[in-house]
Structure formats: C-alpha cells, structure tokens
From Swiss-Prot:
Domain of life the protein comes from: Archaea
UniProt-recorded name of the protein: Transcriptional regulator GfcR
Organism, scientific name: Haloarcula marismortui (strain ATCC 43049 / DSM 3752 / JCM 8966 / VKM B-1809)
Alphabetized InterPro entries for the sequence: GcfR_halob, GfcR-like, PRibTrfase_dom, PRTase-like
Keywords associated with the record: DNA-binding, Transcription, Transcription regulation
Function recorded in the entry: DNA-binding transcriptional regulator that functions as a regulator of central sugar catabolic pathways.
Key word Transcription present: yes
Record region (Disordered): 38-60
Family indicated by similarity: Belongs to the purine/pyrimidine phosphoribosyltransferase family. GfcR subfamily.
Sample GO molecular function, one term: orotate phosphoribosyltransferase activity
The encoding gene: gfcR
PANTHER family in the cross-refs: OROTATE PHOSPHORIBOSYLTRANSFERASE, PYRE-LIKE PROTEIN
Entry remark concerning the domains of this protein: Contains an N-terminal DNA-binding winged helix-turn-helix domain and a C-terminal regulatory domain (or effector binding domain) resembling phosphoribosyltransferase (PRT) domain.
C-alpha cells in the first residue's frame, strides 16, 4: 500500500467481507478511529463523513513483506525474542494477541522455550454502532495462564489500549505479565500498566496537528 486510496480500497473490501471496524483496524494496523474514517470515506459505512478535515492523524505500518514469508517472519520473531531474552526469570508462557501477534508469538515462544497462549481482544467485536460490552478471551486451544509469569507479543502498538487490555486480562487470570514486545511502536511507549514494552521499531509522527 502506497497511498491513502489504497487504504480506503482495502478498508472497503474488508467491510464488504463483513469484518467489524475493530477487525479492519487490526488488519490495516491503524487506530479504530482511522479504520472508521477509511470505511466512511469508501462509502461502505452507514453514515459517511462528508467533512473535509484531512482525516485522522495516524501512521499506517505495512509489514506484509515480513508476514507473507515464513522465513522472514521467523527471523523477525527471533529478533523480538532476543529483546526479551534477559527480561524476567523462569517465564514459561508467551501470549500472542490475535490476530497478527499470534504467529510472531509462536516464534518467540519457540526461541525462549515457553508455552504458547493467545488472546482475542475486545476490539475485534467493535463497530461504530456497538458499545464495548463484550470481553476479550483467551483461546482454550492453547496454554492457559494458571498464575504464571508471561510475555505478551503483538505486531504494532497504535494507542496502547489493546496491550493494556491484555495485561489486565492476564492479571484477572492470576498471571504476571513480565514484559511486552512488538514489531513497531507508534507511540514510543516505555511501559503500559507498569509492564515494560520493547519494540524492534519506533515509528513516531513528527509535527503538530495543524501542520499540513
């Protein structure tokens, strides 16, 4: 994807396939507000925004060149594991945030010799006309928390809300999140809920909202 029109087209396609705006945000690595704006701009949304305000301020991170190749994906995951290798003692569980965090977490878990779990965040159920009443959940097909120390893995941090939700969910299950790692951090966050966050890349928007 090279321009905003590509993103609008992709958002439109995903919306027509029945994905919620939360899922579209996850697929395009943008905030939920940006995903909503893209869908509305495409004309697929129920109430298109006709105001010409230049759109939301966000950064799109396209790491599909890594994700579509298993060898590149492995090496990216191994680099993320290296960032965590000296963070915490006796950590034996890695939690991947679905969807994109799960394959990265698989490599991290393999490299650090931990069990693997996955968490489906609330945002996958989010849409403009729905309140956020549903909870996220841990998949029963993978390892459970069971009061263990764990790492948390995702592809990008946009606002930090999803990572914070996952940390809270781990605490509710009696677990102890020791550290988080992502491919790209768009906020430059050092920690969330007191849990340190590490990233291979920090992608920071420069300029005020009034800049053209």
């Amino acid at each position: 994807m090279k321009n905003i029109d590509d993103l609008v087209d992709s958002a439109s396609d995903l919306a027509q396939r029945g994905l919620s705006k939360g899922e579209i945000a996850d697929e395009l690595n943008v905030s939920r507000e940006t995903a909503s704006w893209l869908v509305e701009r495409s004309g697929t949304g129920t109430e298109p925004d006709t105001s010409d305000d230049g759109g939301p301020h966000d950064i799109h991170v396209d790491w599909s060149a890594v994700g579509r190749d298993s060898n590149r994906l492995y090496h990216a995951g191994a680099a993320m594991a290296d960032l965590l290798s000296k963070k915490g003692d006796d950590v034996d569980l890695t939690i991947g945030i679905e969807k994109a965090g799960a394959p990265l977490a698989t490599t991290v878990a393999r490299e650090l010799e931990t069990d693997l779990g996955t968490y489906a965040p609330t945002k996958h159920q989010w849409d403009d006309d729905e309140s956020e009443t549903s909870d996220g959940s841990f998949s029963r097909n993978f390892a459970q928390i069971r009061n263990r120390d764990c790492y948390v893995v995702d592809d990008t941090i946009t606002s930090g809300k999803t990572m914070g939700e996952t940390i809270d969910a781990i605490h509710e299950q009696g677990g102890n999140p020791v550290a988080c790692v992502v491919l790209a951090d768009k906020r430059g966050i050092g920690d969330i809920r007191g849990v340190p966050v590490y990233s291979l890349l920090q992608v920071i928007r420069v300029g005020s909202d009034g800049d053209s």
